Structures are given as structure tokens and as C-alpha cells.
């Protein structure tokens, strides 16, 4: 079975830097596990590796789509699987640098995501129409009736996950939660998780947002805002929608920046919760342990020799 190394953790913890360092030392190539880094129009807000970093180590699933393309978790899994096969054929180590927990999980494990795109999109359209007419609470109520265990793990505002669960239920006729329990691994994988003191992570997140503003975050957000009438996933991405009130003249720029920092901190907390509850992660602290990377490499070498 193909071995795959995954690097996960909250935003701003240093996943990209570690993935690049490990790729150089372990003869690896990187597959982005972030659902937003595929879009070539958005650079700053998605915190992609720089062009220089991408030149040093080959990256897959970065800048491969337009924000106006349809792109599902199934598309991600199909493309990432192809990338991992390519890397494996070169006798290199595939390194998944991931931020989006469900995408990472769906790739590493055989989750039911639909066999044909037509079926998947058709069923989803039904629930998207229902959401527009009735709102997230009533959508979630339906999931709660059909599958209370699945609903318990999905917050009411997360309509996309609610629709995904309902889509799987419609397509298979089985509870989403039951299918989640029967997951089989797709690869022989090792997951390295980065985490540290919460306040330090929050401080780094605040600094990252400030740097993003200096690099042109507002221009990217304006592009997304100007195209808000078109259906695309980036509309819901943290880093863009927080600035819509500024463009509407409802809030000051500083208020929106603070709102983005708050949203990013909450997202980091949700990331940690998902990885802790859904995946077998080996945790390390890169901010307080000077020997962190050496320990990680020892962990990886032991796994590679199994």
C-alpha cells in the first residue's frame, strides 16, 4: 500500500514550512490539502506557498482551477489520488499539507462521496434549493430527523456539510453516520499534527492577517465581492466575506480586519477539534520544542520502515 505523509494543524502554525523542509530531507513532493488553494485568482488569502517555495519543491493542486469552476470534495480526492500516484511512481514520498479536515479525511480514507458527478450534483441541487427557500435551521432539522448522530456533529450554520450528509443519505439510502464508521484507509498513512499554546497560535494568526493586508488582501477580497453574484465556493471562504461590509459602506476597514482575525481564530479552533475527533494524529509542538523536527523525522523513519 502506498505510504502518504500528512501534515495537519491549525492555521498559522507552520505546516507549509515543515512540509517543504521534510520534502527536501525525505525526497518528497507536496500535495495541497487546502480546499481553497486550487483557485488561481486568490493568492494572499489562501496562504499558498510562495512561487519560490513551489520552485524548490513540486506542489500539486495549487492554482489548478478558477474560482468560477465547480469543485467538490470528490474532485479533490480524484485529483489528489492522481498526484499521489505520480509521486509514488517517481519513488518519492507524497506529503499532504492539509488545512481542510474533511478533505484530508476523504483522501486518506475511503469515504462515500458519490460515484458519478451527475448524481452528486443533482441531489445536492435539491438541497441547495431547499436551503435557499427555508434556511439553514430547517435544513439541519431534516438531517436531525434522518440521522441525529450525524446532525450532532454538524453545526447548524455549516449548511454545506449538512447538504453533503443529506446528499449521501439520498444516494445510498443509509445513514451518513453509519457510513462514516465503516471507513477503510486508502493509503498507509502517517499524520503529523502541529499544535501549541492557544494564545501563541492566536497571536500568530493576528500577525498573519496583518501581513496579508500588507500583501494585497483587500484587492483579492474586492475581486470576490465584485463577483458575488456568481456561484463559487470562495464566497464562503474566511478572508473574503469578512470584508463585504466594508465594500457596502457598513463597517470600517479596521472593523473588518478585526472580524477576520476573530473568524480565523475560530476556524483554527474548529480545525483542531476536527483533527482530534476524526483522525489518528501524532501531535508535536513546533513553537516550544526546539527538537520538534528531529522528533518528527524519527517518527517518520520508523513508520517508513514498518
UniProtKB/Swiss-Prot annotation:
ATP binds at residues 9-16. Pfam families: IPPT. Its cofactor is Mg(2+). GO terms for molecular function: ATP binding; tRNA dimethylallyltransferase activity. InterPro entries: Dimethylallyltransferase (IPR039657), IPT (IPR018022), P-loop_NTPase (IPR027417). Its EC number is 2.5.1.75. Substrate binds at residues 11-16. It comes from the Bacteria. Gene3D superfamilies: 1.10.20.140, P-loop containing nucleotide triphosphate hydrolases (3.40.50.300). It catalyses: adenosine(37) in tRNA + dimethylallyl diphosphate = N(6)-dimethylallyladenosine(37) in tRNA + diphosphate. The record marks 100 as: Interaction with substrate tRNA. Residues 34-37 are annotated as: Interaction with substrate tRNA. The keyword Ribonucleoprotein does not apply. Keywords: ATP-binding, Magnesium, Nucleotide-binding, Transferase, tRNA processing. GO terms for biological process: tRNA modification. Catalyzes the transfer of a dimethylallyl group onto the adenine at position 37 in tRNAs that read codons beginning with uridine, leading to the formation of N6-(dimethylallyl)adenosine (i(6)A). Monomer. Belongs to the IPP transferase family. This is tRNA dimethylallyltransferase. It comes from Lactobacillus helveticus (strain DPC 4571).
Amino acid at each position: 500500500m502506498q505510504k502518504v505523509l500528512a501534515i495537519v494543524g491549525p492555521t498559522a502554525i507552520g505546516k507549509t514550512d515543515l512540509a517543504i523542509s521534510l520534502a527536501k530531507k525525505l525526497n518528497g513532493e507536496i500535495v495541497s490539502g487546502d480546499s481553497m488553494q486550487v483557485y488561481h485568482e486568490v493568492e494572499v488569502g489562501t496562504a499558498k506557498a510562495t512561487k519560490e517555495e513551489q520552485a524548490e519543491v513540486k506542489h500539486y493542486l495549487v492554482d489548478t482551477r478558477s474560482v468560477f469552476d465547480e469543485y467538490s470534495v470528490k474532485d479533490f480526492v480524484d485529483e489528489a489520488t492522481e498526484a499521489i500516484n505520480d509521486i509514488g511512481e517517481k519513488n518519492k514520498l507524497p506529503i499532504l499539507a492539509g488545512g481542510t479536515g474533511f478533505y484530508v479525511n476523504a483522501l486518506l480514507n475511503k469515504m462515500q462521496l458519490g460515484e458519478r458527478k451527475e448524481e452528486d450534483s443533482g441531489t445536492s441541487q435539491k438541497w441547495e434549493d431547499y436551503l435557499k427557500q427555508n434556511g439553514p435551521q430547517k435544513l439541519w432539522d431534516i438531517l436531525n430527523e434522518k440521522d441525529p448522530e450525524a446532525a450532532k456533529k454538524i453545526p447548524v450554520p455549516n449548511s454545506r456539510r449538512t447538504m453533503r450528509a443529506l446528499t449521501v443519505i439520498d444516494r445510498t439510502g443509509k445513514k451518513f453516520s453509519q457510513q462514516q464508521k465503516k471507513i477503510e484507509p486508502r493509503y498507509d498513512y502517517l499524520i503529523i499534527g502541529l499544535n501549541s499554546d492557544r494564545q501563541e497560535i492566536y497571536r500568530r494568526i493576528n500577525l498573519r492577517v496583518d501581513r496579508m493586508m500588507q500583501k494585497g488582501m483587500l484587492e483579492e477580497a474586492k475581486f470576490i465581492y465584485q463577483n458575488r453574484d456568481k456561484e463559487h465556493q470562495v464566497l464562503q471562504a474566511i478572508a473574503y466575506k469578512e470584508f463585504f461590509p466594508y465594500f457596502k459602506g457598513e463597517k470600517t476597514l479596521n472593523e473588518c480586519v478585526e472580524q477576520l482575525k476573530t473568524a480565523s481564530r475560530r476556524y483554527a479552533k474548529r480545525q483542531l477539534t476536527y483533527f482530534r475527533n476524526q483522525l489518528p494524529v501524532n501531535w508535536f509542538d513546533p513553537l516550544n520544542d526546539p527538537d520538534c523536527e528531529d522528533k518528527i523525522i524519527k517518527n517518520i523513519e520508523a513508520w517508513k520502515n514498518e
